[in-house]
């Protein structure tokens, strides 16, 4: 019998672990809820405000026959849930409510009435994990020991009365594409629940999320109408929120939100715990440019979390709460005829008791657009279509109706141009859309979301300071007639310019309210929170690691190397550390070149930095090419239990690296190609292959 090497043993252990996981359904471990996620109240959250966690009681109290649950990390699933609720109400007369999965308990789902329906709109986060607000529900419903109030076992089909609808939001560049909705659907089917229509899946990786959603929902509504005896009617706009102007208050009134994220911030007394619902206003203590070319920017920033009680671990993410650019705020207010009253105070209230107001209130039109609404995002065909009834003239109405009904035409005129809502409407007419209710804009646009960045420092080395590394987005995409500018990275560039002595920062022609609402961010501050990641160094520092991180994908690996250098300086044994780094040109965008050179001198042969420069010669060289060239080294380190890490572009680089690694394993061991692929999959399941990727 051939002798087993270490990687083979790792694979066997992974198979054993996988088998235990399968048969125990995770009894011995579970998806970890983000330790930094807040358990505090969200604005107008019914259950979180101390009210019932019994969803059936809530539906009975409020006269609802349709609940739409969402599991959302960035706000998209929540937006889709709200859109489904609105459409169900307006087109089919359903009494709908939107519900955050973490607001309720689920032991009484076996008593769900037959004449009601539950929707589940679930995003898959990271490596096939539930979003933070869906962790507890997911653990409950998929658990082997799931127990309902009736005491019925899974074999007795306790959810036979439950009618449900599912839609998943995923990304096909990730290994576990739409795992959440698939696993939930299987669990509900096993428990006897009746799915209405197909289990929908949207693919952000292919850029078809919106069209996948639109294509799925029409046959779903048909199936639901048949199952529940619904009659479609002409959809007429019915506001979810009541927006009123308050002439008794001015923008200077201390009770008016001018961009403050919470009541504590409004009152000038922000208190922790700081989280995704309550950011810390952190000082930026250092900011500098990493590129040496003038037409592109990459920022290094040091953000202090001293005194906040925020903590992080090497490999975690930091969330930056952005501000919309002044030019886009002005454009939006002009398009909707709000420029003259931008500083008027408005109150926003939910017409239905279950409606959650996404914006702090009272506020102003300007503050809502600048700090709270995602006005720069690509606009959806469905939302554009909803504005037809409020068009300034018949010709514009006809054009909007065509855009709404013809997906190819919409793709040509709007999607290809990467237009946001204001740009899209400006491309149709110069007349303002003054008749559009502001409530419709709040309903149709997402809340402005924090953007996440891989932390590029070690918590062991600087526990009170977080480093971030970010390329500033200002690119002309194929087909677009204008530069597409990143919301957060250009905001950060403006802060860097101001900190470094430029009196009037205007990155790529944009200006920002740098000092924040009521000058509360003066002195170069930015709102942040920390999010836990499973992207971690081995607990044993003597274990080898292989890191693949081109461009800003090197960010977490700077932290990894920083930490290993600190451990080595303390006399600890540090395993072989290999970094595959790629960029265009060593003299233009080789990030942290001098730092890495110093670490190489300190760590000697234990640190190997292997570079790939794509534009130095006529032949483009990428990290996957260097990986293949170093096949023997990679194979040897895997035999020594090396952990393999990838950070960066999911759509191309990460896929290529995954493929090349499988080929290396197969070739170096004389195995069939499919065996190499299988071994990489087992490395993933055992945690010895980790990704921090984006598309």
Swiss-Prot record:
Residues of the Flavodoxin-like domain: 66-221
Keywords: Cell membrane, Endoplasmic reticulum, FAD, Flavoprotein, FMN, Lipid biosynthesis, Lipid metabolism, Membrane, Mitochondrion, Mitochondrion outer membrane, NADP, Oxidoreductase, Steroid biosynthesis, Steroid metabolism, Sterol biosynthesis, Sterol metabolism, Transmembrane, Transmembrane helix
Protein's cellular compartments: Endoplasmic reticulum membrane; Mitochondrion outer membrane; Cell membrane
Residues holding FMN: 72-77, 123-126, 169-178, 204
EC primary class: oxidoreductase
Residue intervals passing through the bilayer: 9-31
Annotated residues for binding of FAD: 451-454, 469-471, 486-489, 694
Positions that bind NADP(+): 296, 552, 614-615, 620-624, 656
Cytoplasmic-facing ranges: 32-695
Lumenal side: 1-8
Cofactor note text: Binds 1 FAD per monomer. Binds 1 FMN per monomer.
Documented EC number(s): 1.6.2.4
Cofactors demanded by this protein: FAD; FMN
Entry superkingdom: Eukaryota
An example Gene Ontology molecular-function term: NADP binding
Pfam families: FAD_binding_1 (PF00667), Flavodoxin_1 (PF00258), NAD_binding_1 (PF00175)
Gene Ontology BP terms: ergosterol biosynthetic process
UniProt keyword Endoplasmic reticulum present: yes
Cited InterPro entries: CysJ-like_FAD-binding (IPR003097), FAD-bd_FR_type (IPR017927), Flavdoxin-like (IPR001094), Flavodoxin/NO_synth (IPR008254), Flavoprot_Pyr_Nucl_cyt_Rdtase (IPR001709), Flavoprotein-like_sf (IPR029039), FNR_nucleotide-bd (IPR039261), NADPH_Cyt_P450_Rdtase_alpha (IPR023173)
Location of the FAD-binding FR-type domain: 277-538
Its membrane topology: Single-pass membrane protein
Catalytic activity: 2 oxidized [cytochrome P450] + NADPH = 2 reduced [cytochrome P450] + NADP(+) + H(+)
Family: Belongs to the NADPH--cytochrome P450 reductase family.
Task performed by this protein: This enzyme is required for electron transfer from NADP to cytochrome P450 in microsomes. It can also provide electron transfer to heme oxygenase and cytochrome B5. Involved in ergosterol biosynthesis.
Name this protein carries in UniProt: NADPH--cytochrome P450 reductase
Organism (species): Aspergillus oryzae (strain ATCC 42149 / RIB 40)
């Amino acid at each position: 019998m051939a002798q087993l090497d270490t990687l083979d043993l790792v694979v066997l252990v992974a198979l054993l672990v996988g088998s235990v996981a399968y048969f125990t359904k995770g009894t011995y471990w579970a998806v970890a809820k983000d330790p930094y996620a807040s358990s505090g109240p969200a604005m107008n959250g019914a259950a979180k405000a101390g009210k019932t966690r019994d969803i059936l009681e809530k539906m009975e109290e409020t006269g609802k026959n349709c609940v739409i649950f969402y599991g959302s990390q960035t706000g998209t699933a929540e937006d889709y849930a709200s859109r489904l609720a609105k459409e169900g109400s307006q087109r089919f007369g359903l009494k709908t409510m939107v519900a955050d999965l973490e607001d309720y308990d689920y032991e009484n789902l076996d008593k769900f009435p037959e004449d009601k329906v539950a929707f589940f709109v679930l995003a898959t986060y990271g490596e096939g994990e539930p979003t933070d607000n869906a962790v507890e529900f997911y653990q409950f419903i998929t658990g082997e020991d799931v127990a309902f109030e009736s005491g019925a076992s899974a074999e007795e089909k306790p959810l036979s009365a439950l009618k449900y609808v599912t839609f998943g939001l995923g990304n096909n560049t990730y290994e576990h594409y739409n795992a959440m909705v698939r696993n939930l659907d299987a669990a509900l089917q096993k428990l006897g629940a009746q799915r209405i229509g197909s289990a929908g899946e949207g693919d952000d990786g292919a850029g078809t999320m919106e069209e996948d959603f639109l294509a799925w929902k029409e046959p779903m509504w048909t199936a639901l109408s048949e199952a529940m005896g619904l009659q479609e009617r002409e959809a007429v706009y019915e506001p979810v929120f009541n927006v009123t102007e308050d002439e008794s208050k001015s923008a200077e009134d201390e009770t008016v939100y001018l961009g403050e994220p919470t009541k504590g911030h409004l009152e000038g007394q922000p208190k922790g715990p700081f989280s995704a619902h309550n950011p810390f206003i952190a000082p930026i203590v250092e900011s500098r440019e990493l590129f040496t070319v003038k037409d592109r920017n990459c920022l290094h920033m040091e953000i202090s979390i001293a005194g906040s009680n925020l903590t992080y671990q090497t490999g975690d993410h930091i969330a930056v709460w952005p501000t919309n650019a002044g030019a886009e705020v002005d454009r939006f207010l002009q398009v909707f005829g709000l420029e003259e009253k931008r500083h008027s105070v408005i109150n926003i209230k939910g017409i239905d008791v279950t409606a959650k107001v996404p914006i702090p209130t009272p506020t102003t039109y300007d503050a809502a657009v600048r700090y709270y609404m995602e006005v720069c995002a690509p606009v959806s065909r469905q939302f554009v279509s909803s504005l037809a009834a409020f068009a300034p003239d018949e010709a514009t109405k006809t054009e909007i109706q065509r855009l709404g009904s013809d997906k190819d035409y919409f793709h040509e005129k709007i999607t290809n141009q990467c237009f946001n809502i204001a740009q899209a409407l400006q491309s149709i007419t110069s007349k303002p859309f003054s008749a559009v209710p502001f409530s419709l804009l709040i309903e149709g646009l997402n809340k402005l979301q924090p953007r996440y960045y891989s932390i590029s420092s070690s918590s062991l080395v600087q526990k009170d300071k977080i480093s971030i590394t970010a390329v500033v987005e200002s690119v002309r995409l194929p087909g677009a007639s204008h530069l597409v500018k990143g919301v957060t990275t250009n905001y950060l560039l403006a802060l860097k310019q101001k900190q470094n002595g430029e009196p009037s920062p205007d990155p790529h022609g944009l200006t920002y309210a740098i000092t924040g609402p009521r000058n509360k961010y003066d002195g170069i501050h930015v709102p942040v929170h920390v999010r836990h990641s499973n992207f971690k160094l081995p607990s044993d520092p003597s274990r080898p690691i292989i890191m693949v991180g081109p461009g800003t994908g090197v960010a977490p690996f700077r932290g990894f190397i920083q930490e290993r250098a600190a451990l080595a300086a303390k006399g600890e044994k540090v395993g072989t550390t290999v970094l595959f780094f790629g960029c265009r040109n060593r003299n233009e965008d080789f990030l942290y070149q001098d730092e890495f050179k110093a670490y190489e001198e300190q760590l000697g042969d234990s640190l190997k930095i292997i570079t790939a420069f794509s534009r130095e010669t006529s032949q483009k060289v990428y990290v996957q090419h260097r990986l293949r060239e170093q096949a023997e080294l990679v194979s040897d380190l895997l035999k020594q239990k090396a952990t393999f890490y990838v950070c960066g572009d999911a759509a191309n680089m990460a896929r290529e690296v995954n493929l090349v690694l499988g080929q290396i394993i197969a070739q170096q061991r004389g195995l069939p190609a499919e065996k190499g692929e299988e071994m990489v999959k087992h490395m993933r399941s055992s945690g010895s292959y980790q990704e921090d990727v984006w598309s």
